[in-house]
Amino acid sequence: MNIEEEITRCEIYSKQIKQYDPDPFYVDYFFTKYINSINNIVNGIFEEANIDFGLFITEKVTQRKFNEKANLKKDEDALKFSKWFSKKNKKEHENPYPNSMNKICLFKNENEALPKIKIMIRATERYKNDFYQEIKIDLKNRKIISKEQLDIEIKRQTPIFLEIINAKRNQNDEPKVTNKKIISSAFVNLEKNNDVEIMYLCQIYTPVIRRLIDESREKIKELTNWK
């Protein structure tokens, strides 16, 4: 498994999500592929570590398998790397968006599917704790039937959306939102009152996983330098 190919796939899937946003069917399709690549990257880091530490794991490499073989061989440096990775991975996911991605990945791994995707209105310029308004339209096979119907429903929901978001914006001395500064996008919800925009989440998360790859390789190099 080639990590660099997987990170390139993440970038491609992120662009495809942006292209098809907010269509639930296509966003779900490419977001699923994005998450599969993320899981492959994490396993790929331990595949590289398996080679560099000389553990000779022949089956599919995961962190658990890596730990089992390192314990069996009493390879303290390999165990140090795994412990470092766990701490580093946890730290990288402390911020809200990476934390949400981690929860979505866990949900998908446990349920073999993503949480339900919904279409919501948001302001084009994002501010912390902004209000999002769900819009419901007819779908065919989970696909948007017509952009015209979507636009009609956005227009219908706009007055109440602007009233609520601008009350919040005014309270926080933030720029006012007008009807020309709203857009629809696909969101997922894992927890009450915590809707996460998928396109934006992927844009934020790709640099996080890139950093995790680079720093993991540096740590492996540091721990195997004497070998």
Model-derived segments and spans:
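Acidic, Ser/Thr/Gly/Pro-rich intrinsically disordered interaction regions
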Residues: 1-32, 50-227
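Extended, well-ordered alpha-helical segments in internal regulatory regions
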Residues: 40-52
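Glycine-rich, low-complexity intrinsically disordered segments
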Residues: 29, 33-36, 43
